[in-house]
Structure formats: C-alpha cells, structure tokens
A protein has these predicted regions:
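C-terminal boundary/linker of central alpha/beta nucleotide-binding cores
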Residues: 1-68, 77
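Extended alpha-helical scaffolding segments used for macromolecular assembly and cargo binding
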Residues: 72-153, 162-166, 441
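Internal alpha-solenoid helical repeat scaffolds
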Residues: 139-314
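"A position-specific structural signal for the A-helix of alpha-solenoid helical repeats
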Residues: 81, 94, 114, 149, ...
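Amphipathic alpha-helical segments of tetratricopeptide repeats
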Residues: 39, 96, 116-117, 132-137, ...
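Structural signature of alpha-solenoid helical repeat junctions
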Residues: 74, 94, 100, 107, ...
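Residue register of alpha-helical TPR repeats
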Residues: 9, 77, 110, 145, ...
Length: 450
C-alpha cells in the first residue's frame, strides 16, 4: 500500500528526482522506495543518474487511477507541492505549469512577477504568455507588474488596441494612488518602462521621454525594471526599436543623450552608447575599424557589469564588420565562440538568432548545404503563427528560400511581417522585407517588383 500511494502521488509529474519524490509524497523513505522500484520492477526509467520517469503506458494508467481515487482537492495539493519544489529550484517555467494545473492563481501571479524581474525583456512575455492569459482579469488589475506584462504581451501579439487598454488601466491605477504610495511609485515606474519599451510607440518621442525619466530617477520618483534593449538580436539600431531615424544626428545624440540613456537603462546601458554610434556609422557605410578597436576592450566590462544582450550586439557588429571587410572565417568564429559561451551559461534565448546569423554567413560564403541544413532543422517555418520576436529568423528563412529558387515561399514567409513593420515603424526590417519581396517578384516575372 505505501508503494502504491507513492506511485500515485508521483504520477502527475513527467520526471522527478529523489528530493522531489520526497517533497511531493511526504514520504521520508522515498529513497528506499525508488531503490526497490528500480531493483524489482520495470516501472521506472532513468533520465540520467539523478532523475527518473515512468514509462508512458504505465504513467497513463497511474494517472487514471489517481483521477479515480483522489479528490480534486488532493490532486491540487500534489501539484502545489510539485510547484513548490520547482519554485525553490528557481525553475519558474515548471513551477508555473504545476501551479496552473493546481488552479493556484495567486501563486501564478506571484511567480510571473518574480520571473519578470529575473528575466527582463520582451522574450520573457512570449515564453510566459499562456500563464498571463490564464489569470483572472481582477488578479491582473491588482498588480502593476502584471498590467505592464499584459500591455507588452498584447503589443508582441500585434494587438495594439489591447496593449493601449492595459496601459490605460495601469495609468488609472497610478492616478488612484498617492504620491508617496509604494504601489503608486511601482505603477509610475512600469508606465515609464512601457513609454520607452512598447514597440508601437516608435522612437520619435524618446528624445523627450528619456531625459524626463532620467529626472524622475534622479529625484527617486521611479525605479525602473530591467530592459532588453536588443530583444536578443545582434543589433541596437534594429533591436527592441528601430533607431535608424536617429542615425542622421548620431554625433549630437551621442553627446546629449549618452548619460541619461546609461542611467535610465542601468546594466543594459553598459557599452550601449559606443556600440550604437559604431553601428550607426557602419550602417551608413563608414569605416568603423577604429571604433571597433576602442569598443572591443569594453567587452569585459559588458560581461561583468552589463547584460548578455549587449555582449551579443557588440559581437554581432564585429562579425558584420568582419564580413564586410572580406573576413568571413573570422566573422563565423566570432559568433561560434560566443554561441558556445552562451550555451554553457544557459543563455538559450539567444541561440536561435545566433544560428540564423551563422546561416547568413554560410550564404555569404556560398556554403548552401549548411544554409539548407539550418532551414530544415531550425527555421521557424510557421506563416500562420507569427512571432515578432523571431523576425530576424523569418528574414533569414526568406533569404534561404530565395537561394533555393522558391519565390512563392518567400512571399508566404514575409507577408505576415508587413503589418508589424508598418505599425512599429521598423524602417530597416522594412527595407529588408521590400528588397527580398522585390527579388521574389522579379524572379516570377511579376512587374510589381518595381
């Protein structure tokens, strides 16, 4: 009987280790039971020397038995214990899964807030979308952090009306709070973050917004959450926002905005100004070799005091300048070394864009087999489910399709991006999109290419 109960209580979980088995079952002899099961039965399989799972047919039977025997309250308690185990390990994705299955909305809210602080930037919202969407509206309206998250999430889903609605709710929340109220200060901080970060806002007002937020910071009226300036892309000028309009006055903006920008962005601002002006000059066709030589020594400071986003932006610019000066092998090595380093550090959200960048280098050097391998194994290829965070990969995918002589596939890949490019003033992405579309039309002998 104790073994049977032990099995039923672990059935909801795909895999587990000894510590989790002990915590979920509450059985101090969990180690002995696992040892007995491994020795005398074939119910358990090893994931590795620490983790186990039931074979799928047996787990399905156990779950059926558990549904039959355990009350809903008891099942929810098991999920809550599993959620607590993952929470203590700071594995918030699995913890959220458990708490959602157990219907514990307050824990889901709490973890979403905590996870947003641990993993800043727009990528977090896309990963956590289903948990945000599962929360009751009243729960979201009670939390400035969750309203901020919903506003950004709607923007990333290209629901700009929904995004502005949640921005308005957050604004109303801030107005209801007093100037000294901690919740009011948090709401004003989140509004300032959205004013800078929302993709549909463009960059036109940022030259006024950033100094205004800088003054609020200096007066300790707001404390800003972390940003993701690049959205895990190898660029600042075409990262979270398109800053190409600033390129005309880059020297003036560098002198006037450098200090406010670095103060407002905190860790995200380390190395940003120097990388941004070097990239601006590069995009205008100027020689940036000298600027790169002064920028590279800052990489250590970026690693120690900054963010991996900026590290990728600097390395991405270096690789592009190496490619432009006829050193494709060096460009490939720059990205490969960084990819290995990021993989070791568990920074997996950058890897898909790094792989896409390596694919572009392969096409530049004529290694079409490698480009086709990326297309088969890693390209998004999901025209009906647009994720704007993958736009760099969509454009790379279209390049491979052109290379393979498939102009219809190019149009299918690029068409969903057009509304995003227009609504969010993405000038550089728009140039890439229009050039690739024009080439595809030309190859089809369609006069619209003009």
């Amino acid at each position: 009987l104790p073994v049977r109960r032990f099995l039923l209580e672990l059935a909801p979980f795909e895999s587990f280790d000894l510590e989790m088995a002990r915590m979920v079952s509450g059985d101090p002899r969990a180690g002995e039971r696992l040892d007995w099961l491994l020795r005398y039965t074939t119910m358990l399989r090893y994931d590795d020397c620490q983790r186990f799972h039931f074979w799928s047919g047996f787990r399905a039977f156990l779950r059926w038995e558990m549904e039959r025997e355990y009350t809903e309250e008891k099942r929810k308690a098991l999920f809550s214990r599993g959620g607590l185990y993952y929470e203590l390990k700071e594995d918030y994705a699995h913890a959220l899964e458990c708490y959602t299955s157990g219907g514990d909305h307050s824990k889901v809210s709490e973890l979403l807030v905590r996870n947003a602080e641990l993993h800043p930037g727009m990528g977090h919202y896309a990963e956590m979308e289903k948990y945000y969407r599962s929360l009751p509206e009243a729960e979201i309206l009670a939390s400035p952090s969750l309203m901020q998250g919903m506003s950004m999430l709607c923007a990333l889903a290209m629901d700009y009306e929904g995004s502005e609605r949640w921005y308005g709710e957050l604004q109303a929340f801030a107005e209801r709070c007093g100037r000294q109220d901690a919740a009011g200060k948090q709401a004003r901080s989140r509004l300032a973050w959205l004013d800078i970060s929302l993709p549909q806002r463009g960059v036109n007002g940022l030259t006024e917004t950033i100094p205004a937020v800088f003054r609020l910071l200096m007066n300790k009226e707001v404390t800003l959450p972390s940003f993701s300036v690049t959205s895990a892309l190898p660029s600042i000028m075409n990262g979270g926002k398109d800053f190409s309009a600033w390129s005309k006055k880059d020297d003036l903006l560098y002198k006037t905005l450098r200090l406010p920008v670095e103060a407002v962005l905190g860790r995200d601002g380390v190395g940003l100004a120097d990388c941004a002006i070097a990239e601006s000059k590069f995009e205008k066709g100027e020689d940036v070799a000298g600027r790169m030589l002064s920028l590279l020594p800052q990489l250590n400071e970026v690693r120690n005091r900054g963010t991996p986003d900026m590290e990728f932006a600097v390395s991405g610019l270096l690789a592009r300048s190496q490619l432009a000066s006829g050193q494709p092998a060096d460009a490939r090595r720059t990205i490969e070394v960084l990819r290995e380093c990021f993989a070791e550090r568990g920074l997996t959200r950058f890897l898909p864009n790094m792989d896409a960048m390596l694919c572009r280098i392969d096409m530049h050097t004529g290694d079409l087999d490698a480009a086709d391998a990326w297309y088969r194994e890693k390209a998004p290829r999901e025209p009906t489910h647009l994720n704007v965070m993958r736009r760099y990969q969509y454009l790379t995918q279209a390049m491979v399709e052109l290379e393979d002589g498939r102009p219809d596939a190019v149009q299918l890949t690029l068409a969903p991006l057009e509304p995003y490019v227009q609504n969010c003033a993405r000038i550089i992405d728009g140039i890439h999109l229009n050039v690739l579309t024009a080439i595809a039309l030309y190859r089809k002998k369609d006069e619209r290419w003009r």
